[in-house]
From Swiss-Prot:
It is found in: Cell membrane. It is a multi-pass membrane protein. The gene is secF. The chain crosses the membrane at residues 14-34, 121-141, 143-163, 175-197, 217-237, 247-267. Part of the protein translocation apparatus. Forms a complex with SecD. This is Protein-export membrane protein SecF. SUPFAM superfamilies: Multidrug efflux transporter AcrB transmembrane domain. GO terms for cellular component: plasma membrane.
Length: 274
């Protein structure tokens, strides 16, 4: 028995792994929460060129600015990115730079009102995207169970991606939100690939073979997309590109579980039961 045949024969066991992973990710999201970036909650982001470590910069920023909720991380370019949940004047920024012996590379400020507008837009965009996908999927298949399975896989992809964001500290920003929308688009493609390839082979004795064959194509897509996303993750010169790459990688991990295990199991059981 080959590798792909073993994969199909063990779908029942793999489904347990998929569900456990989803529960862990959902729990992480609820317990830890996904941090919102300044473009969604408002505030100031300062990029400093300094040799001081992020912890030192955080403590200095809190002391000078009188704000406790300060975050500082080292970027892939070696700069320190400081996020402060309030408006900073030019004097505030210069004081911070002098305190840590650094130079100001850039400053980005988002007002609280604009941040709320962005956040409200995000909360509307995701449900609209899922509704649009549900209409398209149902129009293609005209099969409620298959359509529900695809939408279930999409929802699990988002749950898993948000959980991994919570665990790794990747914030929810406009950039990472774009990554989440990319996940929806990619997941629709992979689920339709699986569903179309398998539904066309209706006879029960061919279902496992159809799933295994479609998995070969799907896992090749995952491998090539992951390679591109990892290159962007490692070599990106922009924080936005870094966040997009991270979220896409999380989504690809989730899609392997939710398309090629969860949805494959639903399709096999649906066809086998006819």
């Amino acid at each position: 028995m080959g590798l792909f045949e073993k994969y199909v024969s063990n779908l029942n066991r793999l489904l347990i792994l998929t569900m456990v992973f989803a529960v862990i990710c959902a729990g992480s999201t609820l317990a830890l929460g996904v941090k919102k970036g300044i473009d969604l909650k408002g505030g100031t982001m300062v990029i400093l060129k300094t040799e001081k470590d992020p912890d030192t910069v955080t403590s200095e920023a809190s002391r000078i600015l009188g704000v406790s909720d300060v975050e500082a991380i080292r970027s892939s370019q070696g700069d320190v990115i400081v996020q402060v949940p309030k408006y900073l004047s030019a004097d505030d920024v210069n004081k911070l730079a002098r305190a840590v012996g650094g130079e100001v590379e850039s400053v980005q400020t988002i007002g609280p009102a604009l941040g709320r507008v962005f956040w409200e837009s995000v909360k509307v965009a995701v449900p609209l995207a899922l509704v649009a996908v549900s209409i398209v999927v149902f129009a293609i298949f005209r099969k409620p169970l298959l359509s529900a399975a695809v939408l279930g896989a999409l929802a699990l992809d988002l749950v898993d991606a948000l959980g991994l964001m919570a665990l790794t500290g990747v914030p929810l920003t406009l950039a990472s939100f774009a990554g989440l929308l990319m996940i929806i688009g990619y997941a629709v493609d992979s689920n339709i690939l699986l569903s179309m390839y398998t539904v066309k082979r209706r006879r029960v004795r061919r279902v496992d073979r159809a799933i295994a064959d479609s998995f070969k194509t799907g896992i090749t897509m995952v491998a090539t997309t992951t390679a591109a996303a990892c290159a962007l993750f490692l070599l990106s010169m922009s924080e936005a590109m870094f966040e997009i790459a991270a979220v896409v990688i999380f989504g690809l991990i989730a899609d392997v579980l939710n398309t090629w295990i969860f949805n494959a199991w639903v399709i096999r059981e649906k066809i086998a039961g006819r």
